[in-house]
């Protein structure tokens, strides 16, 4: 998990043990923060490999939103760390991936095709209804341990959705499956 400024400039984006977690931001802002410091959001397979050995089907002790990164214990009393030493991959908060997903087919989201102006005057996307541009999330969140794990994915949220249970982590381009 990363800490970052809220201006998408990357000036205070850090990956530090005990850093303040940045959440409640849209996918685009997390991607911009990572790019500002030479990182990218991980790919689906990149996250799966990096998170291997992390806690599976458990979440953070207390099932509460953590304020800081690293050093957490899961509901089974195990340190929440992967075989590669990555902290908080699973059971802390859903983490945005670079990968596109299928749209949410829930009838309440379906609608006509139209252009949606992206926040920050950065262009538009052509999408169907309210959730036609879905990005994958990985790892699981603090409030539902049974859905957490290195291969756990959610394709429910569109990229301009922001809540406390969604965050991001950055990785070097070669480790993200990006050439």
What are the residue ranges of the model-derived segments?
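Structural recognition of the beta-strand scaffold that forms the well-ordered cores
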Residues: 40-42, 85-88, 93-96, 136, ...
